C-alpha cells in the first residue's frame, strides 16, 4: 500500500508540472513560460566558483524546479566540475567533481559498485544508459550519476549515493548543448 501511495504521489508530482515526457518529440516551447534568470547570470556565478571553460549546458527539471547544469573544465586542476544553478533564483545549489574509476578517495568511500547502482537505476527506469559518471560533491558526497534514455521515450538523469545505494535525485533533461568529453 505504501509503495502504491508513493508511486501515485510521484506520478501526480510529475504530471502536475504540466510536462509530458512520454513522447520525446513533445513541443518544448513551454520552456518560455518559466520565469527564469538568463543563463549568463548562472554561468557567471558558476565561473566565480569554478574558473575554467564551460563544455556543456543542460536545462533540467527537478521536482517542479528548473535548473541549469554546467560542465566546466577547471583552469586550476583540469578536472570537469558539474555546477548546478537554480534557474528561478540564479544561485548555485551544487558543485560536483567528476572522477574516474581509479580515484582512490572515491574507491575507499563507495560501499556499492557502479554495477549495483546501474541495476537499481534500470529497474526503476528501464532503458539505455547513455552516460555514467562518478562524482565527489563539495559537500563530501559520493555519487554515481546516470543519464538514461528510457523505454518510455524521455531522458532522465539519476544520482545514486555511492555509500548507501539510495537514489538521491532524479531530473528530467529538457535540453543539452555541448558534449561529454570522450
Residue ranges and their predicted role:
Residues 2-12, 16-182:
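Long, terminal "pre-/pro-" and other extracytoplasmic accessory regions
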Amino acid at each position: 500500500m505504501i509503495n502504491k501511495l508513493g508511486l501515485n504521489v510521484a506520478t501526480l508530482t510529475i504530471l502536475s508540472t504540466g510536462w509530458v515526457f512520454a513522447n520525446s518529440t513533445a513541443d518544448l516551447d513551454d520552456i518560455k513560460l518559466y520565469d527564469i534568470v538568463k543563463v549568463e547570470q548562472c554561468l557567471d556565478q558558476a565561473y566565480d566558483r569554478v574558473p575554467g571553460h564551460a563544455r556543456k549546458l543542460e536545462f533540467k527539471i527537478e521536482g517542479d524546479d528548473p535548473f541549469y547544469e554546467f560542465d566546466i573544465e577547471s583552469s586550476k586542476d583540469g578536472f570537469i566540475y558539474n555546477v548546478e544553478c537554480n534557474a528561478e533564483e540564479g544561485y548555485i545549489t551544487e558543485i560536483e567533481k567528476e572522477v574516474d574509476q581509479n580515484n582512490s578517495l572515491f574507491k575507499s568511500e563507495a560501499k556499492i559498485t557502479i554495477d549495483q547502482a546501474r541495476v537499481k537505476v534500470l529497474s526503476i527506469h528501464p532503458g539505455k544508459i547513455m552516460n555514467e559518471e562518478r562524482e565527489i560533491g563539495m559537500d563530501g558526497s559520493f555519487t554515481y550519476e546516470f543519464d538514461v534514455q528510457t523505454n518510455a521515450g524521455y531522458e532522465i538523469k539519476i544520482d545514486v549515493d555511492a555509500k548507501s545505494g539510495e537514489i538521491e535525485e532524479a531530473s528530467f533533461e529538457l535540453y543539452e548543448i555541448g558534449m561529454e568529453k570522450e
